[in-house]
Amino acid sequence: MYSIAIISDLHDWHSKEIEYHLKKKNCEVIKLSFNEIELNFSKNKKIFFNKNLHHIDGAWVRFINSGSLEEITTKLTFIHLLKDSKVYTHNSAETIEKTVDKVRTTGILKINGIDSPDTIVWINKKDKKIKFNSLL
């Protein structure tokens, strides 16, 4: 039996559907919010996640709420460290980073020759105007 963690800042109908279908496949399901995840970087311990994540086989990442840059990057770090710990991660940090950031998504599409709408990105509307990929 696999043990799967569903990690989300908001457990809604989608988390319930994922849980239902995982249980139908005979998986043990643990639902956690990001604020329930603890890291302990003690030099005497190899495992640094809290006990809820010690023995999971996979993680299904759902919803990351808004927050400060530090809060969001910490949540992404949790996800990166799960993968680095050899835990299969659905919706990996890399995937989230590539799809949530519209500038990065557009850039990846352009680099790979995939058409997308013309895009302009402003860093500071008063001082600087940067055209992203020359209007693609």
Please report, for each region that a protein language model flagged, where it lies by residue.
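Redox-cofactor binding/interface segments in oxidoreductases and associated redox assembly factors
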Residues: 60-61
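Short, charged/polar "capping" segments at the starts of alpha-helices
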Residues: 12-15, 39-40
